[in-house]
Amino acid sequence: MYEYNRMLVLLFIIILVIYTLPRYRRPQVFENFLTNDECDHIIQKAKNDLRTSSVTNEKEVDETIRKSDTAWLNKEDPIVRNIMDRCLVHMDRPFVNCEQLQVVRYEPGGFYKPHQDAFENDKNMRMYTFILALSDEYEGGETIFPNLNK
């Protein structure tokens, strides 16, 4: 019996380690993911709520690290929910694990220095990021995936 229990504990530890090791997927690009009406809806909803973006979950503003504006859209809005549901088809997490939809506006000269979407001692780490570009034409800007050398 002892040997059986030890085997179960070992199996549990192996499964836990496998589950917690980061698994990096190749970035994917989906052209025309949003309709023009959906883009307009997001822009209109966010327009009045845009605030200077913070750098940490403590609402600290440091424009040497990040210069942009952010608004958070209610994920229960029917159009926002539909967009998020379409994003979730490509992920292995349920809707209840999602944050509100974050809208970020970068004006000319805006930036966000290299960072990870993670916070020290925070239980709510982001496991996935789905980036939706609302404008086709822009200059500069890039998203880098250092663990994938991309």
For the regions a language model picked out, list residue spans one by one.
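Fe(II)/2-oxoglutarate oxygenase catalytic core
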Residues: 2-150
